[in-house]
Each structure stands twice: as structure tokens, then as C-alpha cells.
Amino acid sequence: MGDMIEFTSKQRKALEKLAHDLQPVVIVGGAGVTEGVVDMIDNSLNAHELIKVKFNEYKDEKKELITEVCQQLDASLVRIIGNVAILFRPAPEEEDRKISY
């Protein structure tokens, strides 16, 4: 696994702007961050690179949970706004990347 990306404030702002109109693609509910949820996040990152994950439950633990998921999936946390986390992971192949950072 590689390292999570450390964004400059300019890069972070650009990614936040791109994520603004996105709807959450994964919702964390009563079961918490299960293997199925992690798989959904992984598949969504493969398809979109930039996604939102909404926490309907476990709101107090969201920072720790999403940090753990990012480490598992080699993704980067852009920002948490309210109960929504914005995650980014570039496509492994440069020619497949939709977002430059």
C-alpha cells in the first residue's frame, strides 16, 4: 500500500469544489463500517476517484472510522463536513485518472 496523499490547501479546496454537487454514494448506518461498506467504498473509489460517505449512525466516531477506512483502502480524506466525509483515491493507471490534483 502507498501513502495517503497530503494535500496543499489549494488542492484540498479544488477537490472540495469538485465534490460539492456529489451525492453520498455510501451511507454508514446502524451496522457501522462493515466489510460490505468498505467494499462499497473501494468500488466507488475505483469508479469515481472522488466520493462522499455519509454517516447516519456512529457520528461521534466518524473521524476515527473514516481514517481507518482510508488506511485500509489507500485513500485520502479530503475533509469531513457535518456527517459527510469526502474521500479521494486516484486511479492506479495515470491514463485512467479523471481528476488531477
Model regions and ranges:
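Positively charged, polar, low-complexity stretches
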Residues: 2-101
